[in-house]
Amino acid sequence: PKSNLPLKVIVLDDTQRNDDVNNPNSLGFGHGSLDQQRYDWLVQELELGQAEGKLMMIAAHIPIGVEPFPSMMGWHELAPVTEAQLIAKLHEYPNFILWAAGHRHINTVTAFKSPDPNRPELGFWQVETSSLRDFPQQLRVFELVRNSDATVSILATNVDPIVSEGSLAAKSRTNAVA
């Protein structure tokens, strides 16, 4: 890594807490959700990173904008901070470039285009990663590259760990959930 690319990684717990939603019909706590305290903290971190001129990424468990409620993969419809509010807020920071998430255990990339066509720098990317436990048992390496034209590229590389035949790791692949 080179130190001339200032990067702030914000690690965010965006999982539904047992006190986030006062709903006896909740299907558990697998949804995305932010209470006001976590949201305020996130906004403070984004403001600070923007003021410091740092590129910013968020590492969270639950992806955003993927599947509507009641799917267990998306944001809870009764979350104190709605998914739409969160995405709109993220679009306010030109230095915010990446939301990295797991939860669905799939490898996919989604563009969140700027709501203002005259300000494309307000858009960002979401990269979802697979699981080390479940099929396909991969990990992802992220590289941020400053290009010669002053743009930034995000490289997301899937890695298949090499495992010895007959090892516990190799056996686990035969038991991985597909």
Residue ranges and their predicted role:
Residues D19-Y39, E47-A100:
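Active-site-proximal segments of metal-dependent phosphoesterases and phosphodiesterases across multiple
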Residues H103:
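Conserved active-site segments centered on acidic
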Residues P1-E52, N107-A178:
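Metal-dependent phosphoesterase/phosphodiesterase active-site architecture
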